[in-house]
Amino acid sequence: MENKAYMYVLECGDGSLYTGYTTDVQARLKKHQAGKGAKYTRARLPVTLLYQEEHPSKPAAMSAEALFKKKTRQAKLAYIKERTQNA
């Protein structure tokens, strides 16, 4: 059985959104904040965690990330708002 994985969304210092996946959100966030994450976020510090979503496996989280990245910024924010209000 595979471990749980997460799709996460960061808000960058320039207001842009970054989407990724990981098995440990807090450790990954610390890497991004330390400038050791993705090249995209290194150039746009500071970053804050805007949203995280649990998935049953890494492939499921990767699939969710790919689908999320296809959305417009407005659709991404609406998706996050809808899920965080119902939590």
Curated annotation (Swiss-Prot):
It comes from the Bacteria. Residues 3-78 form the GIY-YIG domain. It holds the Pfam family GIY-YIG. InterPro entries: GIY-YIG_endonuc, GIY-YIG_endonuc_sf, UPF0213_domain. Disulfide bonds: none annotated. PANTHER family: UPF0213 PROTEIN YHBQ. Belongs to the UPF0213 family. This is UPF0213 protein SSA_0709. It comes from Streptococcus sanguinis (strain SK36).
